[in-house]
Amino acid sequence: MVRRRGVVYYLYKESLRCTEGKEKIMRTVTLLTNALFAKQGEAFAPVALPHTWNALDGQDGGNDYWRGVGTYQIELPAPTKGKRQFIEFQGANHVATVYCNGRELGTHKGGFSTFRYDLTEAMKPEDNLLTVVVTNAKSDIYPQNADFTFYGGLYRDVNFIEVEPAHFTLLKDGTAGVFVTPRSNGKTRIDLFPVNADGHTVTVDVKDAEGKVVATGKAKAEAHTVIKLDVKNPHLWNGMADPYCYTVEASLCAGIDVLEVAPVDTVTVTIGYRSFHVDPNTGFWLNGKNVPLHGVSRHQDRQDKGWAISKADHEQDIALIKEIGANTIRLAHYQHDQYFYDLCDHTGFALWAEIPFISQFIPTKEAHDNTISQMTELVAQNYNHPAIFFWGISNEITIAGETEGLYQNLTELHALCKKLDPSRLTTMAQVSMVPMNSEHTYITDVQSYNHYFGWYVGDVEDNGPWFDKFHELNPDRCLGVSEYGAENILKWHTAFPDNHDYTEEYASHYHHEMLKTFATRPYLWSTHVWNMFDFAADARDEGGVRGRNNKGLVTYDRKTKKDAFYIYQAYWTDKPMIHVCGERFVDRAPDERDITVYTNCEEVTLYVNGECIGAKKAEDHAVVFKNVALKEGDNAITAKHGEVEGNTITVRPVAEHNFAYDVPEGNQGANWFDDPAAVAARKAMKFPAGYYSIKDKVGTLMANSETAAVLKDAMGKILGGSAFGMMDAKKQTDDNPMSGFYNMMRLTDLMKMAGKNVTAEMKQQINDALIKIKKD
């Protein structure tokens, strides 16, 4: 405990001691848990570390969260005589400049990787002050623009480290200075980087999961020391089925005869022995067995915490992802906490790890160098994790177009990954409109696309044909689905789900259709839902919710699993389960009384108020009981299969549809419910069968002269000539790739892109004109 300016600081200290009863402390790691913090121009105040200054304003909408400079002051422990001191930051977003007792130690650019500085020469016998100036303001550092909040601050652990003068380097790209390359046949190469180690010896022990030494070796310590070992018949790391891990304990000892000499430094890393490859027709193979990769993407933030989350938060996320039955995680869109990678090693998830080279390409040297730096740190710091299989070099980076500078940057990142780590594969997530034959689809080892057919554009049924066409045109390319999803807001409900209605029911329908699509396409090497959890995106304001992307299968606070969660569990897990959908869809009008059940059982029986209604066989892991009879008042509904019983929901019959379940026009959700008269006055749009409407695709509307005339008069004024020109269905997509993208969009989606320029009244007028025109 230390005291400064009337504030008490508690420090956590971890000591690494030598083995076999020797009591000499080799290195100490002290977790710094408190600081003084001030925004630019404001007074300092105590905060707990980890810390972000955007925990609340980064999630409340308005695209106005504070992006600027924050300063931290942290008192350091007194140095131990004869040792060297280092400071370690595991995450400081975006740029951090570090000072010790007023001496500048350096600046780190990149908000997601570990970095360290040597404090030794700046330290005093006591009263040492660390000052860290952090900024998340815009600069030539990635990410620049993206659909998530960039939380500022020291949001991960800060550690004070002491080591002997001779130690494994702490200054090699934020790593532990020990890199292990294990082969599935047991051949093991260890690259070690000791410093100040003349006259020292490096020893290495490989231990199995029970702690038994299965291989050992030693070598004279050199600046780059290489030791090669052979583990006989290694127990393979086999994903979720058997994530068996070994540990490598590397020690640095003074002298040549080290049997009786205590090590001066020891580093322990986790490894796994495995082999894998990806086939363009059959997908992912692990240790000679075909293992279809199906899983989720994950953002690291949480409600009211932002990125400053705890180990318990990481553990809960892992547990939820395991519960749904996933076997792969795309850790988007940046390097995640080392603790989460550790959890994945021991749980068995196959990981895609990536850098935040996202959305907007910056054609400057500083930005280019930052991609190289962030990729180097990502690969180096995560080299030993058996869970990682793929390095992601970018996400939707061609949104603003494909340029030669961007292409060169991407090819350089691919080459860098192969140089640093030839044992893994590279990938990238393409935005949907990238042509199937774009040169960008051939940069990385395997390819993935972010596709939202059925949400942003087109229909959910468009996904399968697109995958098939790509596979036909590129039979030797491995294709994956890096993102897909639909907004899923718990307060909106319908018995007639439709694209962009934001209801829980449409999201469930969408995800079920995607699962059916994937089930018949074994050539997809991976699929990753966007997203496992709702996350903050302060610029968002849609579906009656501000500041949030609601595509998660679990809510932002991790308290509620949405209905769509359970269709995945039904497909992906073997333990018998039953889930009755519609828990939040309580009021049911006469035509809204179907009950849907998700299950991995062959058959389920429905019970209403304890009475057996009947049994039905599951089809594609779902059962729909049509027009279930309800009594007045509350009705308790559940489903069973033998000893397996699902959840119980409560529904009640009402005479008419409850309009409180409908997302309002203009996304002003809160306003509708403040004034009941406004709800009653709403005019529902009509979409008569056999007639055109704003729900039709732009390409369809432009192909008909009458409907095209309606659009030209109405939309030309809003979008302008150039944007309207891109909508022309007669243009060749080779000349203008964006035209194909717009043609697949529903007119409602294009209106949405126009934002507030398209009012509810304008939508109504355009739709009224279109529904007068009969389809051929």
At which residue positions do the language-model features occur?
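Secreted/periplasmic carbohydrate-active enzymes, especially glycoside hydrolases
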Residues: 1-331, 343, 348-351, 374, ...
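Long, contiguous interaction/targeting segments characteristic
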Residues: 86, 94-162, 497-569, 574, ...
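Short phosphate-engaging motifs
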Residues: 94, 336, 707
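Substrate-binding/catalytic cleft of secreted carbohydrate-active enzymes
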Residues: 318-321, 328-560, 564-571, 575-589, ...
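Compact, charge-rich alpha-helical regulatory domains located at protein termini
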Residues: 681-759
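Death-fold interaction domains
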Residues: 752-776
